Amino acid sequence: MALVSYSSSEEDEGETSEPPGRRLPPLPPPTTVLRMFQDMEGDEDLDENTKHEGRIRSFKHERGNWATYVYIPFQPQEEFLDLLDELVSVAAENGVLLTKMSEFHISQSQTVVLRHHWINPFVESLKDKLHCMYRFLCIAERIKVYTNQEKTRTFLGLEVSVGMEHLLEVVSEVDRSLQEFNLQTFYQEPSFHVSLAWCVGDKYEKLKGSCLLELQKVIDRFEDSDTLTRFNAEEIRCKAGNKTFCIPLL
């Protein structure tokens, strides 16, 4: 809906002017209109969120651009969070203060930029390619350290050891959708993992070596760790700005 302003020359010259006196304040826009613009500009709030806790955007924000990525969610048992607390504690003892992730997943794409009007067509493309895929088992039990491409953040993650072939199949289909929109595809040799915690800066050297061995021992000794680090991939999600779309697997 376009909002059009008219100059005084375009107004009806036959109308009589209002009598002098105090004017009433203008009425507020209808709630439906406000909601419409709130939905269209939801990426403004996202832009502020990406600056939170010192995180740095990997691409310049522009109005109408929506940060978008595809992933498989991992919803852990409560005991898994106890294991994560121990891992964060060991990292702190080695001089690295980590922030636990608020949600857990296995990435199936890089973060790309979608224009608002591309979102629904992109999601439909994903659904068309992924809706016939079956659920599969994932096991992620080996601790590993990662950094983002810009070396501005460091992550502690669990590398996937079972389910690789299925994940590669998903990525192949997601890449096809990305290519349709001339967007960057996933890494050629991906290391599928569940990110557990993160910190600002490049802390790779501090976490590797003896610290990494100590972290792995925590996992190996933790009660029922073999069941806590496995899950069934039951759906694929696409998050675009503040919108999340779910594609269930068979």
UniProtKB/Swiss-Prot annotation:
Comp. bias intervals (Pro residues): 22-31
Keywords, sorted A to Z: Hydrolase, Lyase, Nuclease, Nucleus
Residues annotated to bind UMP: Q149, Y187, S191, F192, H193, V194, S195
Record localization: Nucleus
Chief site of localization: nucleus
Catalysed reaction equations from the record: a 3'-end uridylyl-uridine-RNA = a 3'-end 2',3'-cyclophospho-uridine-RNA + uridine; a 3'-end uridylyl-adenosine-RNA = a 3'-end 2',3'-cyclophospho-uridine-RNA + adenosine
Gene Ontology CC terms, in alphabetical order: nucleus
Region of interest called Disordered, as start-end residue ranges on this chain: 1-31
Active site, UniProt feature: H105, H193
GO MF annotations in UniProt: 3'-5'-RNA exonuclease activity; lyase activity; poly(U)-specific exoribonuclease activity, producing 3' uridine cyclic phosphate ends
GO biological-process terms attached to the record: U6 snRNA 3'-end processing
Pfam family membership, one: HVSL
Binding-site residues for AMP, renumbered to this chain: H105, I106, S107, Y187, E189, P190, S191, F192, H193, V194, S195
Enzyme Commission identifier(s): 4.6.1.-
Function: 3'-5' RNA exonuclease that trims the 3' end of oligo(U) and oligo(A) tracts of the pre-U6 small nuclear RNA (snRNA) molecule, leading to the formation of a mature U6 snRNA 3' end-terminated with a 2',3'-cyclic phosphate. Participates in the U6 snRNA 3' end processing that prevents U6 snRNA degradation. In addition also removes uridines from the 3' end of U6atac snRNA and possibly the vault RNA VTRNA1-1.
Protein family per UniProt: Belongs to the 2H phosphoesterase superfamily. USB1 family.
Name of the protein this chain belongs to: U6 snRNA phosphodiesterase 1
Gene name of the encoded protein: usb1
